Amino acid sequence: MQEWSKGRIARTAGCAAAIMLLAANAQAADKVGVSMPNIKGPWFTPILFGISDDAKKLGYEIIIQDAGGYGNVDKQVSQFSNLVVQQVKAILLDPANPDSFNGAVRQAKAAKIPVVGAGSPVVASSVEADAAASSSHCSIGHELAKGAKTLLPNGGTIAILAGPPGAFWASDRLRCFKEDIANSNLKIVAEQTSEQDAAVALSLANDFLQRFPNVDLLYGADDTYGVGAGRAAQGAQKCGKVKVLFAVLGEAAEEIMRAGCADYVVAQQPVLIGRTAIGMVDKLVKGQPLAKKLEEIALIPVTKANLDSISKTTMQAPKGWTP
């Protein structure tokens, strides 16, 4: 009887250990990686909020990797490869430079790990994404061109804060912007890339206003640059006289528009992009069909006239939220 009890206890302990091991494995299997060039600022914070908020609802643990800036491409590639080694269920990726990610994305595909673009329709220049949620960067450029023509119907001069050097999203926007203004009376008099930092953008915009005191419009690749341009116009007491045009409507961009120092914003919906991207991951992980492989999230032109009538919940994270 005593031996039987010991055997029963041993079997029970063994079963408990097996259950715990299975539970641990199940928990590990629920991890999803997120690889971003940066995790701070008016673009990355809301997209990460959308991902994180819906990931909790879907039962996933998110591992966020921050490369610390667009200049750290090698670091981002290394972080992505590390997520593959960790055998996460899927990876959400916004690549600093898609040309650098071909090998890493192939590595993920070989490991049967889906790679989904989050804020980027492209994950690697030669390897297709399993899915993506984004706005077309070329479409943003076209919409910015519409904005420039609306603000300067008779033509004028433009100084361009072009975005981070080497960032494909910024170059795509600017390329398509230039295509649309090529045969107009709009003339680009200055163009400069710079670090994606508000203080750097402000300094660059101030420099433009000093070098080109009669410039008609400042173009910002996104609202980090646009807010810098707006604050420069504000400091020079040129709000309204120098038009300010950019993409993405974060909190600071909204404030600068209310102050009359930003005139036209092509607003993206990064919270919605994040929610859509993690939803696509969930379907891929569960082997369910996607409605579309690429979900293009609509752009919303914003001026002071419609600023109060549009919902910001798909554009901005809750105040104080950080990744």
Question: Where in the sequence are the language-model features?
Answer:
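Extracytoplasmic "Venus flytrap"
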Residues: K31-D54, L58, I63-F80, Q86-V88, ...
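Bacterial N-terminal signal peptides that target proteins for export
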Residues: Q2-G14
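Hydrophobic alpha-helical segments within soluble ligand-binding/sensing domains
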Residues: V32, D74-Q76, A132-I158, V200-L202, ...
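Hydrophobic alpha-helical
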Residues: S81, L93-K109, F177, A190, ...
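Hinge/cleft segment of the Venus flytrap/periplasmic-binding protein
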Residues: D30, L161, P165, I181, ...
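Short, solvent-exposed amphipathic alpha-helices that sit
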Residues: W43-Y60, I140-L144, F168-K187, V200, ...
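Sec/Tat signal peptide C-region and signal peptidase I cleavage site
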Residues: L22-A28
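Flexible loop/hinge segments that line or gate small-molecule binding clefts
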Residues: E61, D99-S139, T150, T157, ...
